[in-house]
């Protein structure tokens, strides 16, 4: 599937958001035109408008994400897998407005609803769930971890994979997540650390699958740690489709571009074409299947 130093095969962005009021189909088309074949469409809270106040609000918000996925499949022809769940920042914001107990109760209910929709085949993964990626009070942090442990237990009982939204604290972050997985009975290979660094070493991932934020320098980081990697991993942009932050976090064309750059970098490492093809196919197809299905 290598052709003139480029990759002609599956290319999947494993964490992308779309907004029906912003670029939406144009962003999906941009990804497709660059060579992309599939996306994981991750539910995005309406931080700029209004957050869900009850479970019916969540049901409507989740349905909007499912509707967008359907339109992208129909209009653009991409393979779209949906990730549904309540965002941990939503929980933190609402803990300040409705109280931590009510916010937690709503959050857990929203997890349950997402798992029901996953069980029904509407989505394939719970996410992005986790804990605040910024500093909060010690009390709030303890509550976030208690809630995340419960969410992991729910995912384990439902046999659902999860995508994790967590802080960047070096190797300690994945070590913490691995410990929580073990306590919850959730297999580590079903807990995907989203927005991960390009350090693929076992020390950094603690055996968790990760989706790497494929910004500048990511190819170099991947190549320098690839021999110490024993986890499945994928690529993501975390494209927000936010009119207030155009292009953030990374643009829709990034993953096709970085895939081709990785092919060239691996060739410079004296990998032969067959080995490169197997590896890229693992990233964009085989490891996705074993993690999510």
Place the predicted regions along the sequence by residue.
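Mid-domain alpha/beta scaffold segments of enzyme catalytic cores
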Residues: 1-158, 164, 175-184, 194-200, ...
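Short loop->beta-strand "edge-of-pocket" segments that line small-molecule binding or catalytic clefts
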Residues: 233
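Positively charged, amphipathic and often flexible ligand-engagement surfaces
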Residues: 236-237
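Solvent-exposed, charged amphipathic helical/linker segments at domain boundaries
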Residues: 186-188
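Gly/Ser/Thr-rich loops at beta-strand to alpha-helix junctions
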Residues: 168-171
């Amino acid at each position: 599937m290598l052709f003139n130093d480029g990759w002609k095969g599956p290319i999947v962005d494993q964490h992308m958001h779309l907004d029906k009021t912003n670029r939406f189909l144009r962003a999906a088309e941009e990804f497709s035109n660059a060579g992309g074949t599939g996306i994981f469409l991750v539910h995005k809270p309406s931080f700029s408008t209004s957050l869900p106040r009850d479970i019916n609000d969540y049901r409507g918000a989740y349905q909007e994400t499912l509707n967008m996925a359907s339109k992208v499949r129909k209009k653009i022809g991409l393979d779209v897998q949906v990730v549904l769940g309540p965002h941990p920042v939503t929980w933190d914001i609402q803990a300040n407005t409705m109280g931590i107990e009510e916010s937690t109760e709503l959050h857990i209910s929203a997890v349950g609803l997402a798992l029901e929709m996953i069980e029904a085949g509407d989505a394939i993964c719970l996410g992005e769930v986790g804990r605040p990626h910024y500093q909060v009070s010690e009390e709030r942090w303890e509550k976030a971890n208690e809630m995340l442990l419960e969410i992991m237990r729910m995912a384990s009982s439902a046999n659902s994979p999860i995508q994790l939204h967590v802080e960047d604290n070096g190797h300690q972050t994945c070590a913490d997540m691995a410990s929580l997985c073990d306590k919850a009975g959730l297999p580590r290979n079903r807990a995907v650390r989203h927005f991960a660094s390009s350090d693929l070493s076992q020390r950094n991932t603690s055996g968790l699958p990760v989706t790497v934020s494929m910004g500048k320098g990511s190819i170099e980081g991947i190549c320098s740690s690839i021999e110490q990697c024993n986890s499945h991993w994928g690529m993501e942009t975390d494209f927000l489709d936010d009119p207030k932050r155009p292009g953030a976090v990374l643009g829709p064309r990034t993953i096709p571009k970085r895939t081709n750059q990785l092919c060239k970098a691996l060739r410079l490492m004296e990998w032969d074409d067959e080995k490169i093809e197997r590896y890229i196919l693992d990233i964009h197809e085989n490891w996705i299947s074993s993690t999510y299905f």
